[in-house]
């Protein structure tokens, strides 16, 4: 029999709370979904942090709360964290999370790309939070920047932190 490793990204940084009532938007919802995924068989939990309004964030306090609570309940799970952060974060902000938490795994993006989801909320009748519309529409004029210099910095930071890369390739 083949062995399979299941990795679960509980939430990414693209979708917003208004897109689904089932979306794990708050830190506690993210924690619960991660624990549920682990109990269902996920060995790797890929984590993005969000604040109480469901907005993607990269602050250490929110990330620390989420990571520590998942690890308490799932001590055997491999926890990987995003270096994609949230749209609008600087390269330094995105990678500082590795140096601070020294996670087992973290995403290593293999290149830059045009990453637009500006029409995501067009068919949503009621947007729950003020931040959502601007968050998605600004991607129309946005590049998800991962230059060779950024990638090298990311890998060096991971090596120094003992973090394994989870390579993410978006465009082939």
Feature names for model-found ranges:
Residues 9-13, 50-52, 82-86, 109-113, ...:
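Active-site beta-loop-alpha junctions enriched in small/polar residues
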Residues 30, 37, 48, 106:
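Conserved, mostly hydrophobic/aromatic
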């Amino acid at each position: 029999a083949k062995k399979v490793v299941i990795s679960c990204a509980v939430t990414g940084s693209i979708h917003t709370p208004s897109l689904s009532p089932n979306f794990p938007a708050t830190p506690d919802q993210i924690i619960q979904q991660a624990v549920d995924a682990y109990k269902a068989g996920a060995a790797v939990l890929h984590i993005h942090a969000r604040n109480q309004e469901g907005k993607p964030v990269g602050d250490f306090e929110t990330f620390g709360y989420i990571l520590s609570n998942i690890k308490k309940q799932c001590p055997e799970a491999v926890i990987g964290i995003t270096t994609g952060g949230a749209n609008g974060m600087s390269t330094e902000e995105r990678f500082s999370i590795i140096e601070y938490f020294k996670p087992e795994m973290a995403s290593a993006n293999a290149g830059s790309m045009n990453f637009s989801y500006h029409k995501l909320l067009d068919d949503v009748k009621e947007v729950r939070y003020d931040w959502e519309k601007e968050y998605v529409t600004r991607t129309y004029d946005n590049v998800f920047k991962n230059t060779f210099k950024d990638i090298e910095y990311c890998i060096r930071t991971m090596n120094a932190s003992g973090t394994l890369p989870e390579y993410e390739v978006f465009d082939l």
